[in-house]
Amino acid sequence: MPFSVSWGILLLAGLCCLVPSSLVEDPQEDAAQKTDTSHHDQGDWEDLACQKISYNVTDLAFDLYKELADLSQTSNVLVTPTSVAMAFAMLSLGTKADTRTEILEGLNVNLTETPEAKIHECFQQVLQALSRPDTRLQLTTGSSLFVNKSMKLVDTFLEDTKKLYHSEASSINFRDTEEAKEQINNYVEKRTGRKVVDLVKHLKKDTSLALVDYISFHGKWKDKFKAEHIMVEGFHVDDKTIIRVPMINHLGRFDIHRDRELSSWVLAQHYVGNATAFFILPDPKKMWQLEEKLTYSHLENIQRAFDIRSINLHFPKLSISGTYKLKRVLRNLGITKIFSNEADLSGVSQEAPLKLSKAVHVAVLTIDEKGTEATGAPHLEEKAWSKYQTVMFNRPFLVIIKDDITNFPLFIGKVVNPTQK
C-alpha cells in the first residue's frame, strides 16, 4: 500500500455584512457615485469565454446550494460559490491527469470549449475586478497556503498560484497541531477583522498543506434606507415554530417582482460599488417549488422584469453563517479522485503522494439597521402604510448576491431562522 500524506484545504468565504446606509448625505459619497468609473470595467467582461465561466460558476452555485439544502431542511444555508470555484481551480494547478480533469469539469467547465489557461486567466480577472481600487464595495479577497516545514512545493505551482490567484505561502509546523491551528486561526481572524474566529478546530499531525481562501464583503445600499421603526414580530420557521425577531419596517420604493411560476416575491437591493442582492420570498409552503424551479436562466428573466413599486417592507435583522465539510458535497458533484489515494497532486509536491483530506467552507451574513435612521410618529405612518402592498419576510427565503461587473455569484443561501448562528 503506497504511503499517502493527507493535507487539509480550508475554504473560507468570510464575511458578508449588508449594512444599509444612513439618510445623512455624504458629499464625497454622492460625488463618487456621480463619477463612478466602474462601468468602464464592463469592457473587460465582453470576453465570451469569461462570460461562459461566470455562467458555469452560477450553475455551480445552484448545485452547491441544492446539495447543502438537502443535508438539512431545517437549517440556514450560506455558501460563496465563486470562492469555492477559485480555490479548487487554483488547486487544480498542482494536479494532473484525471484528477485535474475531474476538478475542472466538476466546476461545470466544458474543457472542449474552454482552454484550461483561459479558465485561470478569467479567475485572475475576477480577483482583479473584485479588488479594484475604485470600488466602494469594500470587498476583500485573498488566499494563503500553509505548508509543512518539512515539505518542499514545486516552484511552478507556487509561482502560478501567486501570479494568477494572488496566493501567499507560509511555513508551518503541522506536527504541533495546536500551534498550527492557532497560526491559521490568527490569520483568518486578522484578515476578516475578527468576524470569523476559531475556524480550525481540529488538525491531524500528518497534514502537509492547507489552503485558506476568503472573501470579506461590507456593502451599502445605493438607495437611502430609512427604518421607520423596528418592531419585534413573528417569523415562521416552519408550520409548528414561530420565533420573535426584530423586523426592520420601511415604506418606500423598491425594485420588486411578483413571479407567478415561482409563487414568490423577488426583491432586489443594489449596493454602492456594483453588487446586487436578490431576496426571494416564496408563498407559505412553496419553498420546495422555488428550490425546484429556480435556475440561472430564470433569475436572468426576473432581472428584466423588475418594477419600481411602493411597498411596505418588513425585513428581519439577521446574522447567519454556514460551515460545511465539502467532501461529501463535492463528491456528489463528481469531484472524487482528489479525496482518494488515486489523487495525482504531483504538481504540488513530488516528495510524497498527496490527497485532499479536508475541505471546510465558512460564510457569514449579517443584515441589521446600522446606519439607518429611526423616526417618530409610527401611528400616523401606519395610516399611510395601509394604502400599499405589504411584503413581509416573515418566513424562510432565499438570498443571492452577485457582482454586477463580472456577473459572478458572491453568495447564495437560505434564511430559515434569522437568529440561528
Curated annotation (Swiss-Prot):
Residues 1-21 form the signal peptide. Expressed in the liver, leukocytes and testis. Also detected in brain, colon, uterus, esophagus, spleen, trachea, kidney and lung. Its main location: endoplasmic reticulum. GO terms for molecular function: serine-type endopeptidase inhibitor activity. Interacts with CANX and PDIA3. One of its GO terms (cellular component) is extracellular space. PANTHER family: ALPHA-1-ANTITRYPSIN-RELATED PROTEIN, SERINE PROTEASE INHIBITOR, SERPIN. Disulfide bonds: none annotated. Glycans are attached at residues 56, 110, 148, 274. Keywords: Endoplasmic reticulum, Glycoprotein, Protease inhibitor, Serine protease inhibitor, Signal. The reactive center loop (RCL) extends out from the body of the protein and directs binding to the target protease. The protease cleaves the serpin at the reactive site within the RCL, establishing a covalent linkage between the carboxyl group of the serpin reactive site and the serine hydroxyl of the protease. The resulting inactive serpin-protease complex is highly stable. This is Alpha-1-antitrypsin-related protein. It is found in: Endoplasmic reticulum. The record marks 385-386 as: Reactive bond. Belongs to the serpin family. Glycosylated. Putative serine protease inhibitor. PROSITE patterns: SERPIN. Changing residue 330 to P: In allele V1 and allele V3.
